[in-house]
């Protein structure tokens, strides 16, 4: 976690954040503040490398009635945590069929990442293409990252294209023999 100035929180500050987050969850469990507190605790847990605690905090939020907009973000974060824990199939199941609204691009990109982890390049390509088509971000960096991912999994569409390339290469060899 960082402060607005970009400095990293110290250990004492992280402990204080966790204590306040626990208090918010306990005293105001039905509010958005409690869900944001759980998300912050999950973020701190990920930074510490405690993916189990991160998953518990995010699951708490889902189990305790997060509003739809918050639930969409929490579900995606939980799926990413589960994937990092090695539960990639579960992660994919968690986000399949979800009406992700304005977060469709992020969901599709995550699906692509999960498919890559499962060794399914074709499905990853389809998901990344869907992410680009629904990209709610105007950030060129975001779009460029998606384009790089697409380039890594783009299927070979037609082997005849490569035959044509080989024929051209053969012609080059013939031309170089004529020159000699």
Please provide the spans of the model-predicted regions.
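Alpha-helical linker/edge segments of TPR/alpha-solenoid repeat scaffolds
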Residues: 43-52, 80-91, 117-126, 150-169
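Alpha-helical adaptor scaffolds
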Residues: 14, 32-106
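Conserved small-residue packing positions in alpha-helical repeats and bundles
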Residues: 1-5, 42, 79, 112, ...
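"A position-specific structural signal for the A-helix of alpha-solenoid helical repeats
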Residues: 40, 77, 110, 117, ...
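Short extracytoplasmic
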Residues: 1-32
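TPR/TPR-like (Sel1-like) alpha-helical repeat modules
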Residues: 100, 119-140, 151
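Solenoid-like repeat scaffolds
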Residues: 22-30, 60-67, 96-102, 132-137, ...
């Amino acid at each position: 976690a960082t402060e607005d100035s970009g400095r990293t929180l110290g250990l004492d500050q992280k402990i204080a954040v966790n204590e306040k987050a626990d208090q918010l969850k306990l005293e105001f469990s039905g509010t958005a503040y409690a869900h944001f507190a759980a998300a912050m605790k999950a973020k701190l847990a990920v930074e510490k490398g405690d993916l189990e605690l991160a998953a518990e905090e995010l699951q708490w939020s889902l189990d305790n009635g997060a509003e739809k907009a918050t639930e969409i973000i929490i579900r995606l974060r939980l799926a990413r945590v589960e994937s990092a824990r090695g539960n990639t199939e579960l992660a994919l199941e968690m986000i399949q069929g979800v009406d992700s609204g304005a977060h469709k691009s992020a969901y599709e990109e995550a699906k692509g990442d999960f498919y890559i982890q499962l060794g399914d390049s074709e499905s990853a390509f389809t998901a990344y293409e869907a992410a680009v088509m629904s990209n709610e971000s105007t950030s060129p960096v975001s779009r460029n990252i998606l384009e790089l991912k697409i380039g890594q999994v783009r299927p070979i569409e037609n082997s005849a294209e490569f035959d044509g390339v080989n024929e051209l290469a053969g012609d080059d060899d013939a031309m170089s023999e004529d020159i000699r």
